[in-house]
Amino acid sequence: MFAMVGLVLCGRVAQKVRAMRQPALPPVPLAYAFHLSPNCDDRPPDAVINCVVIHATVLNSVEETVQTFLNPAKKVSAHFVVGREGQVVQMVPVEKRAWHAGISELEGVPHVNDYSVGIEIVNRNDGKDPFTDAQYEAVAGIIRFLRARYALPDSRLVSHAAIALPAGRKSDPLGFDFARLCALAK
């Protein structure tokens, strides 16, 4: 039953993306839901996706995060949300710019939202709340999928803390094991 729902959702997403007249990626090959956040816009015409920013939600559930990203007054979103059990919710088509990085810079290039994919992982970001095995697997699956289309070396899988300006403005994702993620995402 869940697979059938996923196929229906994938079909609807594909139709919406084609309607935007942009080259569309096939749906992420994971069981996932899609809820289009209003908090996104077009990437600059010359933008090349070459970075993934990993976040911690500081919220307690996928549902709470989805509701936040669906609220236009919040003016925040990410491309994907990953729950504690590894469930994935896509909130913004990869071809669009999600609003996850804020004022940011990577290797001297500002406006990280322009050229990145944002992945939010449900976690309190207190350094004590562990990231689950299922979350690592799901995030790695998303990255493997993205790497089929975009050049995303391990050095371009970064934390929100690493790109936020001014330095120290963000701390997420505290306690996340990037070496483990890179090994799983090969």
Predicted regions and their residues:
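Soluble periplasmic/extracytoplasmic beta-strand elements of cell-envelope proteins
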Residues: 53, 79, 118-120, 158
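Short coil-to-beta-strand
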Residues: 110-121
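Basic/polar, cationic surfaces and motifs that engage anionic cell-wall
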Residues: 9, 13, 17-31, 122-186
